[in-house]
Every structure is written in structure tokens, then in C-alpha cells.
Amino acid sequence: MKKTWLFAVLAVLIFPLALQAKTTVIYHTSDSHGFYYAKDGRGGFAALAGLLKQEKLPYILLDSGDFANGTVEAKNSKGIKSVLMMNALGYAASTLGNHEFDFKDPGVEPMLRAASFPILAANFVDRKTGKQPEYLKSYQIFNVDGVKYAVIGLGHEYPTNETQKFKILKSSKVLDKVLAEVEAQNPDVIVLVDHNSIADDKHGRESTLLKMVTKHNGKINVVLGGHAHKIIQNAVHNGTLFVESGCYLKNVSRITVETDDKTGKFVSATSQIIPLYTQKTGEYAPVAALANALMEPGMDKVLGSASVKLSRMPVKGNQGDSPLNNWVADVCRAYSGADVFIHNNGGTRVDLEQGTITKRDLVNMHPFGNKISQVKVSGKFLEKFVKYGLAPRNLFSYSGLQIEYKLRKGKVQDLKIWVNGQALDKNKTYVVATNTYIAEGGSEGWPFKQIPAADKKQVGDLSIQEIMEKAIETTSPLGAVETGRIIIK
């Protein structure tokens, strides 16, 4: 009798506590870049769909942009195939990454209109009207099993191609305004999807995401970032959880959100990264069938082979260069005839594995259609450019340069540069080549903006992809590529 009474008392005490919390889930991806398919048993939309089918709790699926380009399927369809895949997954919303503008203004609207989910970009307005076009929204309210989610979106402020159609507003000011509008609707959970990162060390611009969010003292509960291809989990700053999910659909973040069952308001959130191993997730058949139907023909053509793996990352601790980026720079300099070729490391997306090299492998490695531009610069400009690109992270690889430096407290010291074996002369003029994107001042190539467009000339008609194809076909098998061009003392 006493035991029965004790259990009854405990039940009365515990049962109300159990009612205090309600759990919903956010799944997050970013920077998928058209990687629809599993590779070596990992990743792809069918694997993600398989995982979602296993979820027992109510969830919302969100994305932080850069879905439009990065593989041949995405590129050839100008992003529309990516949107079709996301439609099939049931994405609730995404935002605009910088690569959503790879196909310039004419490519943006058809791609976004194909989406069955809202594209949230509060900082993008029509340049003529000052208002958002109908295919963009600032935020969206979602009901997730009775929990009122407000999702705000901010697009990337620096598109890969300058836009004449849109005026891009300052994100921090826009966020202040939209957050006030959202709060007036009394949501339970506020989420920001932003194509920006709290740990971007590769694009040569300081991230403002952390500062503009934390000043709101936790009013934004969860921030879902991207752009830097980083994995960030459970980073809490001033009451806000920051999450980033990597790239290429290799992983997904699962954020568990607890809300008070009585008030409905946000209580807490925690995140975990889930690798999309197909043995664990399975591949959901309808999504796999759609992906296969969208596959571009002819991409399995073998171009040649590699006798060793060519890594895009440095292979020795005191070196800032890598075998694959050096190879890209070398074949492009040979084509251009320049003294120096500058290759932006961010343009190399994946390694070239040992074995056969197909057209798909090459496009996945370097998915851009850029050609080569050539310009004459002073040694002084070249020295400043190299120094800027070394810290906090090495942004570029070079053919024709040897670089040595010390890094002290994040600053470059004792920099030494040799151009084709000769010490750099600040007063000498050098012929420098790079891809057209960097030459035009895109992203980390911004120092080239100070050089007049009339002084830049295109070299030949081949794209860098075509140049690499020819190099593989004529020199296969690719062997080991020397490193040690950038030495950290």
C-alpha cells in the first residue's frame, strides 16, 4: 500500500514536469553545390531523404544557400535541377548564396520560380521598385506540430556576378527591421538562415554575422550559416545557437529544439552533425530515381588517370601549397605564357583521387566556366597581393613564385618572394595571369578591382576546365606534383 501511494505521489510530481517540454527538430544543409549523388557510400539527396524518413519527431528542413552551381547537372540547368531535387525533399525554405548568381541576372528568376519553397532574402530588393519581387520573401512563419517557427533569411552580400536587377541592402540594418516585424507576430522560435559564417577565413572579408546577431541578446534562437564550408555545432554566443553544416551534402545538422509546453516559448536548442553514410541512412528510392533521371549523359567519359591522389589541401605542416592547386596553376600558366599564374584555392572543390579521371571528376573538382585573364602589374602590387593572401589563411596558389614568410600572432613577417628564381623587384613589371573571376575582383580577388578593366585581356578561348582536360589527355597519368612553393618558417 505504501509503495502504491509513493508511486502515485511521484507520478503526480513527475507528470507535470514531463508536460513542460515539447521537442521539434530542425534539419539543416548548406552549400550543396549540386552534389546530388552519393560518392564512396556517402552523401546525396537520396541519403538525406532516407534519413528524414527515419525521423520520429516533427521537423522542418532548411538550407542556407549555394545550391545552384558546382556540378555539371547544376551548371547545365542553371540551378533548376538543384531546385527540383530540393522540392522533392520537401525543403521548407532556403536563402540566396553568392553562387546563386553564377548565371547572372537572367538566370536567377527562372531558378527561384521553380522552387516550391520560399526563398528568404530580406536584404535583396528590386533596384527599380525598392521592393522584393514576388519570388523572394523576408521571412516565413511555419507551424511545426503546433510550434510557431519564424524563419528569417539573409542572402550573401557579395554575389559571384554583380547584379543590376537587385539592390543589396546592409544585412545588419535589415535584420533589425525584420526582427521587429517578426517579434510582433509572437513566434515561439526565431531562426535565421544566412549565407554567411562566423568562421570565414578564406574569402578575405571579415564576417559580420556574429556581431549583428549577438547584439539582439538571444532574441534570435538559432542561426543557420554557410558559405565557409565549415562544420560548427553547439556554438552558443549571447544566448543564440550558431550551426553550420559543411558542404556538398556529405552531412546534415540535426537541431533539437525544446519549447515550453504551457507557454509554447523557446527553452533550448542543441545540435549534432550527422554524416550521410548510405549504409545507415539508406537511399530513398523515389528521390534516387529523380536524381538518376536528372543525370547528365557523357560525364563518365574517361579523360585519363592519376597515379597518385592529388590533394587540394597542403600535405606538409610547414607548407601552404598543395599538389592539386599547384597542378592547376601550372597548366594554366603554361597556357597563358605569363610570368606568374594566381589560382584561388577556393575554386578547387574536391581532391582528384588516384585512378581514372572522368569529366565528372574534373567538373566536380573545378565547376566554373572561367577563362584566363592577363594583366601587367608592378612588383609592389604583386608583393602586397601575396602578403594579403597569406593570413589568416592561405587563399591562393601560384605558379612561377617561391614564397617564404613567418607568421606571428596572425601577421605575416619577413616575407620573401622569388619570381621564376629571381628575387621580386618592386619596381619591375610582371605579366600575371589568373581566372576571369579573380581578375574582375570577385570575392578574395578584390585587390584586382583597382586595375582598370581596359588593362586586362583574355588569353585564348578555352575555359580553365577545357585547359585541364587537354592537360590530362596529353600528360596522363598524372604523377606527384612538387610542393614547397609557400614555406612557413
For each of these PLM feature ranges, what is it?
Residues 1-8:
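Bacterial N-terminal signal peptides that target proteins for export
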Residues 21-289, 293, 319-331, 372, ...:
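Acidic, metal/ion-coordinating pockets
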Residues 282-357, 363:
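Hard-cation-handling environments
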Residues 8-16:
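Bacterial N-terminal signal peptides
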Residues 26-35, 63-65, 305-315, 364, ...:
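Acidic/histidine-rich, surface-exposed loop or edge segments in extracytoplasmic proteins
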Residues 270-272, 304-309, 374-376:
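Short amphipathic
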Residues 23-25, 35-47, 116-123, 139, ...:
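Feature captures C-terminal
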